[in-house]
Amino acid sequence: ATIAVDMEVQKHIATNDRLELSATLYDAAGKQVAQRRTRVSDGKEGITKENLTLKITNPHRWNLDDPYLYTLKTELLSNGQRIDGCETKVGLRTLKFDPNKGFALNDNWMKVKGVCLHHDAGVLGAVVPPEVWERRLNNLKEIGVNAIRMSHNPQAPVVYDLCDRLGLLIMDEASDEWEFPKRKWVKGWNK
């Protein structure tokens, strides 16, 4: 498998420090499976973009029954010392779409059994504790759901993290209107 890591550094002042970007991938047990480093091309003020490619032999693929997640650790180093960075969970998988066969996850053709999920939790409102999301997603998975459509807007990051961890596919939605705002009264749809 190949992971493309796109990194961006914004320097507010010029520096003569030796700046490096590092991307390291760890398996679920914490063992390092891939790493790449590159020197930031210049120390000038402004934005620098770098691309790193990590190669993984025999990857453990994420799937619905075994939602295996790696940890990608990205760092900015100045003279060898970490000055910024983050960790991101990463699932490795392949997707195929065919007009006759449908959808395949990791070369396994399957039915997508999805539901629409809105951002609120009924009487709890729109600020939903993670435990409530986890319970709801587990209940959906127990009744055979394998995919969630995020209706009608991007959800809280915790929902995506839980879907990754629990083995649920996601169809994300940017908005429920593409070109014009809702004007249902124009054709009498509001009656």
Residue ranges of model-derived segments:
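Short, glycine/acidic-enriched loop or turn micro-motifs at the edges of active sites
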Residues: 176
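Generic structural signal for helix capping and beta-alpha/helix-loop junctions
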Residues: 157, 179-180
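Secreted/periplasmic carbohydrate-active enzymes, especially glycoside hydrolases
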Residues: 1-162, 166-170
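Active-site neighborhood of glycoside hydrolase catalytic domains
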Residues: 165, 182-191
